[in-house]
């Protein structure tokens, strides 16, 4: 364990993920989750030295109390480890066009995150609560913001401008921003290492597949196109999100079927995707079980999920010009050999040949190439967003 430890915080609206990460190795010394904020059964769970712990936070507690518990209880019982924490790194979902890289947090940065809240109304306000709680609990430690959208700021305007009146972009910032940037950045770097190529000469298509999912075309280490848009709703079929649809469906739902706009937003974000198609579950594991049992809804959901993903991967060869590898990551990407095989079989025109044994072996945290030695390469790389946040935090405070 080095002296370059970073406490990484990822604040959601009703939960807080945390980890103490060694910026040199990426190893987590402590990892945990505080959840059910605002409810009677608010709890915190954590793991240290392989041992799992759990405690009640108290009824109706939230981010501030969770951070205080981390400081006054968990870290207080590990004084040697706590003494090596050099910074607090915060994952921030949306930085708009204002933030193109990670930054040390000051009042102007907090104001900038507030200004971007309309682009991520569920996430950015929660991040701000976490930042303020961390500043109160760690007044002497530098705080660093790492933005999911920053990696995609290298996209050319032909990739991020929507075919709407241009003044909507100019005056209101309505454009493609993309998400999962920290994950795509990490995985593309690891892919270059596996390919034994400089990142500047590596072209990959990265599929981050979880309950939220996105694909990014990465050319020479830079994002040149990505599937999520102004918000995380655009692009792939996801657990409960619809991804790409005809925008006129919204008009039809409101004016023909009597939905309110709030109901439409809830339908597209929380009732659609794998859940909506299958009428069974949003969990990919449940979808695969249903598929194996012959469940029609699960089978259709799986086919649409894979087909949409394959189409996106195929289209992203256009901005790359040359494809070195397709990379799967995220909970589904790292663990579903079935989905990987289905998608790559749909991309046979690109000369992918799945090695069944390699594909089945690349699960549960194991990385590796999953195609045969002939043809185009596909690989699995477990993501580690926390490591990127820790690395960026140490680099910034040492400048």
From Swiss-Prot:
Signal peptide: none
GO biological process, one term: acetate metabolic process
Gene3D superfamilies found in the cross-reference section: 3.30.420.40
Binding site for substrate: 91
Gene Ontology cellular component terms for the protein in this record: cytosol
InterPro entries noted in UniProt: Ac/propionate_kinase (IPR004372), Aliphatic_acid_kin_short-chain (IPR000890), Aliphatic_acid_kinase_CS (IPR023865), ATPase_NBD (IPR043129)
Cofactor note: Mg(2+). Can also accept Mn(2+).
Xref: CDD domains: ASKHA_NBD_AcK_PK
Cofactor(s) required, per the database record: Mg(2+); Mn(2+)
PROSITE patterns assigned: ACETATE_KINASE_1, ACETATE_KINASE_2
Location within or outside the cell: Cytoplasm
Site (Transition state stabilizer): 180, 241
Keyword Transferase: yes
One of the record's GO molecular function terms: acetate kinase activity
Residues annotated as catalytic: 148
Protein residues bound to Mg(2+): 10, 385
Cited Pfam families: Acetate_kinase (PF00871)
Class of this enzyme: transferase
Binding site for ATP: 17, 208-212, 283-285, 331-335
Keywords: ATP-binding, Cytoplasm, Kinase, Magnesium, Metal-binding, Nucleotide-binding, Transferase
Alphabetized NCBIfam families for the sequence: ackA (TIGR00016)
PANTHER family from the UniProt entry: ACETATE KINASE
Family that this chain belongs to: Belongs to the acetokinase family.
Protein name (record): Acetate kinase
